[in-house]
Amino acid sequence: MIKSKFIVIEGLEGAGKTNACICIKNLLKKNSIKNVLLVRQPGSTPIAEDIRRLIKKKFNDDNLIKETELLLMYAARIQLVEKKIKPALKNGIWVISDRHDLSSLAYQGGGLGIPKKIIYQLQSLFLNNFIPDLTIYLDVSPEIGLARALKRNPLDLIESRSLFFFKKTRRCYLEKSKLDKKTIIINANLNIKKVTQNITKKMLNWLNKQVI
């Protein structure tokens, strides 16, 4: 049996991360990997879910400054990693996470302009460089992604940011993803059926390379 793995799905709003998480979970089950935990960041613990609501809430006169947003993201992330992700992996459970540390580099680093060295310092200090075994980055143009997001629900605080913000965020995502050998880039501008097919193909190829 393959040792439990930590798989992360990344991408802008409307990229199809939820669909990808479900697709991968079902694919793992078809390949006899039945113990799978789905989580989301920020969230998936009581404390982290409260932080999520705070981050996404629109305040009349006191929205979060970018540094506060970054630190809250890390507070939620650390809580989830220590309370759920690490224990699950230790017990042989595979973990699929909707977002992880790359989101902070892209959103707070690329989009909001916080120096990336600060984010790397937080990663090193609090996560001890805890990184995924595989990241799947769903690359979608901001125009297409936000149009999809608008069809779901009213936009939250982060989703309501400017197109320029999301273009900077996407640029950072692509820059980091192309440099990471553990990251697979999927064209998420395509329809959901084609994206699912491409994810399945890439995942099966990756699974076949894992050491038992």
Curated annotation (Swiss-Prot):
Residues annotated to bind ATP: G11, L12, E13, G14, A15, G16, K17, T18
Annotated catalysed reactions: dTMP + ATP = dTDP + ADP
A Pfam family it matches: Thymidylate_kin
EC number annotated for this UniProt entry: 2.7.4.9
GO cellular component terms attached to this protein's record: cytosol
Keyword ATP-binding: yes
Coiled-coil stretches noted in the UniProt entry, renumbered to this chain: none
Source domain of life: Bacteria
UniProt xrefs under Gene3D superfamilies: P-loop containing nucleotide triphosphate hydrolases (3.40.50.300)
Database matches in InterPro entries: P-loop_NTPase, Thymidylate_kin-like_dom, Thymidylate_kin_CS, Thymidylate_kinase
Keyword annotations: ATP-binding, Kinase, Nucleotide biosynthesis, Nucleotide-binding, Transferase
Enzyme class: transferase
Reported function: Phosphorylation of dTMP to form dTDP in both de novo and salvage pathways of dTTP synthesis.
Protein name (record): Thymidylate kinase
